[in-house]
Every structure is written in structure tokens, then in C-alpha cells.
Amino acid sequence: MVSPVLALFSAFLCHVAIAGRICPKPDDLPFATVVPLKTSYDPGEQIVYSCKPGYVSRGGMRRFTCPLTGMWPINTLRCVPRVCPFAGILENGIVRYTSFEYPKNISFACNPGFFLNGTSSSKCTEEGKWSPDIPACARITCPPPPVPKFALLKDYRPSAGNNSLYQDTVVFKCLPHFAMIGNDTVMCTEQGNWTRLPECLEVKCPFPPRPENGYVNYPAKPVLLYKDKATFGCHETYKLDGPEEAECTKTGTWSFLPTCRESCKLPVKKATVLYQGMRVKIQEQFKNGMMHGDKIHFYCKNKEKKCSYTVEAHCRDGTIEIPSCFKEHSSLAFWKTDASELTPC
């Protein structure tokens, strides 16, 4: 028969042994939480693992009881990110992504000519949904362009009802005698507005001066405006240096103001020369002088080789320099051969 004292002592030792086998704080699992979370647990106490928001369990146990051994069983629970649905194809745009898992972001961009109607990025939420919603790519349009003062639409073809699409162009022109400052063509931009509009300004030019030894004609009106024209001419024996017609430009000046150049009096009475590739006689072709800008070739003699060569002479505003090698042939020296009749060197 066991002594009551011995039995009580044995029970005490057993209680101490059992009470001493507590479980430690459980291992941390990626993306999971433990309830209740303590530093130690008595045998028989339970814990429950839960995946954090945005994550779901893939295999393994979630509920555990602290055993008498004081050692937690091996935990094979896996918490993995939620996966949001495929974002789909963004019509007229592109979706950029690396993953559809929580908490990844995806971004959106539209093709040229389209703009994002919605957000530029979306996030995979804890619930496995995209937020904000997936956007759409809408066409970029520009409203009808404002017409500048004193301007008209020269070429306007809206391609979206009354609106124009991205990169559509409009061409303007100014009313007569108004000068356009800027580009006559504007374009619908990616911001949905037009590039800078031109201006149409009234431009006046002063009356063109009459060239010395010449004349000028222009419209008989109080003011000469942009695109008005003036014509010039010279008196006899003078030649116009420059175009016969000038135009009032958008800067308020004339495109050109020509001058009248004096003709050249040839100090040679008689000679055969080359003019425009033909042999002509000075006394016949240039009896009234040689016009400014004209050029002729005089024949010169190479006495050693008994042949001829030509030297150019140019009339410049009443002045011409006769080549020093040229010798005017005298009709009295009939036995001498004129240089123009010799064989070319």
C-alpha cells in the first residue's frame, strides 16, 4: 500500500514535469500572421495562422495545438500573392507590366493620335482587382480652328465630324494686301489644340523712287500696300540694272530698287570683234554705244606666231577698257593683215 505522502509527492513531480514543457513563440512565416501571438504557450493552447491581406494560402495547415513535448509541428503553410486578372489588350495603346500579382502596378500608354481616358497606372489590390479601372485610349481631336482677323480658310477638311484629328492640318490665307506673319499651315497637336496661328497685317510701302536717268510706274492710289507692284525703265542709252518689276513685301519695303546704268562710247571707230559668239563690226553693231553689262572680245595679234587671240572687254556703267594688245587696223595700211583675219593661235 502506497503511502499518501509518497503519492502526493509523485503527483507534484508529474505536474511540474508537464507544466515545464511550454511551447516557444512560433516561427514567422512569409506574408502570414499568428493569432494569438505570444512569447510562450502552455500545452493544449491553440494558434491559427492567417495569410496577410493580398495573399492566399497554398497548401499546409493553419491551426496548431501546443503539444506536451513543447515543440511545434513543422509548418508547411505557404502564403502567395493574389493574382489579378489579365489586364487585356489596350486598344490603340500598350500595357506595360512585369507581373499581375499583388501589389504590382501596371502602366498604360496610348499610340500617337490617342490619349488616355482614365488613369495612367493601376494597382493589383488585396481583393485581386485592378484599381483604378483599366483606362481606354480615345482619339485626339481638335475643335474647329479660330480664323485670324483678315484671314480666310484656304484648306480645311475636318475628318471627325466638325473636328479634326491629330496631325490634321489647316491652311490659311490673308485677304488681299494683308501680309501673313507666321506659318500659313497649322496642325492639330497631341494636346488637342492647334499650333500657333498666323497673323494677317496691313502692310504699307513708301512710293518707290524714280531711278536716275529712268522712270517708275505704280498704281495711282493714295497708299501702296503689300503685293502692289512697280515697274521700272531707263531712258535711251541707259540700261536697267536689276529686274523691271518690284513688289511691296511684308516687311514694308520693295523687293528691289533697280538703277539705270550708262552705256559705253567705244573709242574705236572700226574693228571686227566677237559679240555673243558672232563676228560683228563695231561701227555697225555699236554705232550708238555699248549697253551696260555687254561684253565683247577684241582680236589681238601674236607677232611671233603670226596668229590671233581674243581678249574680253566689259562695259560697266559707261566705262570700258580696251585691251592694250588691240591695234585698230587702218585702211591705209592695206598691205597689213587685220588680227581678226589671222588664224587663231
From Swiss-Prot:
Keyword set, alphabetical order: Disulfide bond, Glycoprotein, Heparin-binding, Repeat, Secreted, Signal, Sushi
Main localisation: secreted
Disulfide-bonded cysteines: C23-C66, C51-C79, C84-C124, C110-C137, C142-C188, C174-C200, C205-C248, C234-C260, C264-C315, C300-C325, C307-C345
Alphabetized GO MF terms: heparin binding; identical protein binding; lipoprotein lipase activator activity; phospholipid binding
Pfam family, one: Sushi_2
A GO biological process held by the record: negative regulation of fibrinolysis
Keyword presence, Acyltransferase: no
Name this protein carries in UniProt: Beta-2-glycoprotein 1
Natural source organism: Mus musculus (Mouse)
Lineage, highest ranks first: Eukaryota, Metazoa, Chordata, Craniata, Vertebrata
